[in-house]
Amino acid sequence: QCQETMEKLWVAIAERYRDCVTVAAYDIMNEPQNNGGYEGENSYDPWNSESWHMSNQIYDRMIKAIREVDRDHIITVEGIWRISNLPDPEKAGWDNMMYQLHLYDGDDMFRKLAAGLAETAQRYNVAAYVGEFQNMHGLGICNEYGISWTTWTYKGANQDVADFFC
């Protein structure tokens, strides 16, 4: 039932904005494999292939529904912290896609993951986007790899994520 409601919502959004040139992309789900620390009865391991498969099934359903009414807008899907959990869009039948990560890592891991995102984007012929980050060197690293980016917040530029909540 939740997926049905979600699909109806995305179809309504796509119908409303399909001709709107100021809408850059549709971001289907924010951090779909993130339990947010929840470890209760219905939690799952965000690092295993089963959770990736579940997310990709939902992505597939939403992308197909959106494409029924809007063939033009970019659709972005998030691998969140790792890009390897997203499928080859051509094999999935997806087009006009942007693959996205959210990176809250230190410089070395940020660089490694950004390099992987850039390589995946080139291999799959998709746009690359870091939709959230707080690393003070992240902007430069994204630019180095030709990755589009948005910082998580404009409140600060310190390494400690706690500084962003001030």
Task: Label each residue range with its predicted role.
Residues 4-25, 29-152, 156, 161-166:
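Extracellular glycoside hydrolase catalytic/binding regions
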